[in-house]
Amino acid sequence: MSIPLPIRTSDGTGNLSSSPPKSNGLPRLSPSPSFVQKHSPRSSDTSGLRRSASHHNARQTFKQRRCKSQYPRDSPERHVEFILVASFHIDRGPIMEHQYPGPISSDEGMLAELMLPDQTHVRSQDWTIFFLPLDTGGEGEEDDLAGENNKRKGKRNRVRSSSGDEGTSADTNNESEVTEEEESSDEEDGGEGPPLMYVLNLVNTKQDNTVKRGAVVKAMAICTRHSFLHIYKPILLLALEDYFKNPYPETLETLYNAVNAMDLSPMPKLNLLERQILQATNSKDMFIEKFEQMVQQRAIEDGENDIDEDNPPSPRRGTAPRYTLPRDTHEFESKIIYNDIPIPVKVPTVIWPEIVGDFSLVKLIQIFSAPHAASPQPFPLHPHLTTSGPLTHPIIVLVNAMLTQKRVVFLGHNRPSGEVAEAVLAACALASGGILRGFTRHAFPYTDLTKIDDLLRVPGFIAGVTNPTFANHPEWWDVLCDLPTGRIKISNHIEPAPVTDGQLYFQQQSPVSASGPNADPTGDNLFMEDVLRSIANRYGENAIRAKWRAYITKFTRVAAAFEETVYGASNIYIIGPNEELSPDSPSGLQSDPGDPTTIRGHGYVWPDEASKQRELMASVSRIEGWRTTRSYYSFIQDIAAMYWPSRPIQKPDLHHHHDRLRTLKLSAYEAGAIYLAFAHAIKDYAGICQLLTVTPESQAGLFYLSMGLLHPDRNVREATADLLERIALHPAGRHFWAQLNRFAKTAYFRIKREKEAAGNSSPIVKSPSDSFGPQQSLVGVAISGVHSQGS
């Protein structure tokens, strides 16, 4: 039996078990003076193989709470809601043939037109994606709401009835699970209206000389609530081919039953912080412990009680167990059985808002970057769009247009409709960064001239078209992205940016001019150079998405600083306890000298005040333009709803003070205050998760934190070492410890040796609040990892 995790209650205190920890059977090893000298640089690396001691400890920890599934077996929600078939009739035009298992919409003509794009007869195959709002109806919506409320009440009642025998700790644990589930549900709902139905559509054209015009055109679509609808492409190819041979509802029934029989229940449900950590890392076994626990739970449910807990199923073994661990925890591997044909599918473990389908940010960036690099063309100036002058990078112009809710059209003349749809989806992900919402709900991955009136009634739409007529009507759009030429145009009919309080504020201030003609106060030029350099160096899609997520995160933090500077407070940032609203509040001071965690400071960090003023002045129009959009108001809702899940530690502001370590030249006293505050505040699982979200691998990981091991104050060095030990024993933190450089690890072991020699404390973690599994020193973890690699 492993040590219970400390559970953070609503008041920020830890609820710890007082039961003594038990040994895991491994020898307790103390750091020896010869260890650092004799072992190779990988001797202190805990990454190793999955059977390392740190991995065993982390997996044991998760047995304290049952791991939930993202898609439970008993869930009433189906993977696929509807299957549609349309065809082109020579006399009647696009017509609907079937809607299975029932009609999704009474407007069959509109659906048929969406499923059969323009010029589809000139291509043998084409893919399109479009969205439909799921009309649940008023009465059904009330029933669904009542059912959800009853479900939550029932869960609370079960918690209360089961907590009587388990004491306060169990009650707090279970109540936190209920709250977490409700917050996750609220996050998925989004509060933007009825849920969207994502439609993946395949169009096939088969030559047939026996019919008029010599071809038969049919389209089949799958309607799902899952945004990862691209996984259904292989089975849709097979099903449409079968439908050409057997055009009957039975063919659709076979497809419907096959896709809904797909088992995704072994996929664990990660909380918000865990999803952020997984998305930002390249480690293929991050949170593998949760997948192992799901396999064990399913084996117990299925009656397979003889499973070896120390050796769960692995995809590398010769036998083929029913449930296997994924090769990469970023994706869950399952299969769909269609007509006795197993079709493998990979479902993303982490799903962010506005991320729909399978697209490539790399491809989108390359399309519009290459012509600009070869022959730059100046844009007409617009305060919301050209934040770096007339030669602002086209991708930045596109992102600015979407952030400020401009009408954006992607034109792909003589291109497949699937290509323009992919560009629209990539643009939504680009501007969202997985953080902001409000783009896909107003996106039209493919549309045509017949729907122009409906399109123009949507403010700030993002549309994909193939008809060149759109290029000749600049009054229909604000920004036109021409895919064949790779050029972006700003319409001469675009509305001018209004004068705002923010602009007046900075005009009244003493001017802070940029130094030199090539100055980049917003940092956008430097950022795009970094992105293009990463693409040229073959960085993967995940790395580029992580960079854009960091860019949008920075944008929201700069916007919060702008609001505090101009308006005195921000709508998009919640300050922690004992913090002052004034933007001039000095950072680094402690409101309570006896509590290191009361160190003040919040928000984005600039190297100096002049840099801050230059960037805010350069970004004022873009920020003010964003503050009037639906994505801004959705972000305010998200900040309020996700405050507790994303910030289990309210004080200090971990992101702000870690940025101070990265950006500023701090004195020994100032840096020591940060290290002590972190060591005192970060004690439990959730706190370490929060820290890891602000120390991603792409930004040096734990490097700046490890510099506390070299601090001149002994107390700071020891506190930093204790914090790193807690991180190394954390299921996700062990990966960050493994990537820490040899120099920092040498300093860590030196501090542990000094503590042992002085007799002040043992190098073994003793407190339950400092441990995430059976007790073991970090040296033992490192040596066990070496033995595992050697075996």
From Swiss-Prot:
Residue ranges with Basic residues bias: 52-68
Predominant subcellular localization, coarse grouping: cytoplasm
Biased segments, Polar residues type: 10-22, 31-49
Stretches the record annotates as Disordered: 1-75, 138-196, 302-325, 581-601
Cited InterPro entries: Actin_polarity_regulatory, Afi1_N, Tripartite_DENN
Alphabetic keyword roster: Cytoplasm
Effect on the protein upon substituting residue 93 to R: In mesA1; reduced function
GO CC annotations on file: cell cortex; plasma membrane
Coiled-coil segments: none
All copies of domain dDENN, residue ranges: 508-613
Any Pfam family hit: Afi1
Gene Ontology biological process terms from the UniProt entry: actin cortical patch localization; establishment of cell polarity; hyphal growth
Domain of life from the UniProt record: Eukaryota
Location in the cell: Cytoplasm, Cell cortex
Domain uDENN: 81-321
Acidic residues bias: start-end ranges: 177-191, 302-311
Residues annotated as domain cDENN: 361-506
PANTHER family assigned: ARF3-INTERACTING PROTEIN 1
Function in brief: Required for the formation of actin cables at hyphal tips. Involved in establishment and maintenance of hyphal polarity axes. Stabilizes the localization of the formin sepA at sites of polarized growth.
Similarity-based family: Belongs to the AFI1/mesA family.
Full protein name: Protein mesA
Lineage of the organism: Eukaryota, Fungi, Dikarya, Ascomycota, Pezizomycotina
